[in-house]
Amino acid sequence: MAWTSVLLMLLAHLTGCGPQPMVHQPPSASSSLGATIRLSCTLSNDHNIGIYSIYWYQQRPGHPPRFLLRYFSHSDKHQGPDIPPRFSGSKDTARNLGYLSISELQPEDEAVYYCAVGLRSHEKKRMEREWEGEKSYTDLGS
């Protein structure tokens, strides 16, 4: 039986100011060719995945990383150029998880997959204002 190994690594996409979210991924996963695999990306508990977009990247041996997709919600997502629909994103907000599903696994899917998070622009601006307010308040107390 042929197996495709899918290695996972950590990538934290840092956006904005203030405390940054951390993402955690299992070190590896594997499945059979032709099957579907779901890779997970857990956001640190002090951040709510509901306000973040999840970005997924693939890096094949000897190649630079390539953008696969961005997922915020079913109605707010973006597939990378030339990325087939068998790559899809989803979220579990109750468990603070983002997922990359790859269906119909093929030999060329053997790669390192990176997840990253980024705030939606309006949330990023709100959090930057809050952080600047906290910083100003702290500076006044000095």
UniProtKB/Swiss-Prot annotation:
Residues 1-19 form the signal peptide. Only expressed by pre-B-cells. Gene3D superfamilies: Immunoglobulins (2.60.40.10). Disulfide bonds join 41-115. SUPFAM superfamilies: Immunoglobulin. Keywords: Disulfide bond, Immunoglobulin domain, Signal. SMART domains: IG, IGv. Associates with the Ig-mu chain to form a molecular complex that is expressed on the surface of pre-B-cells. This complex presumably regulates Ig gene rearrangements in the early steps of B-cell differentiation. This is Immunoglobulin omega chain.
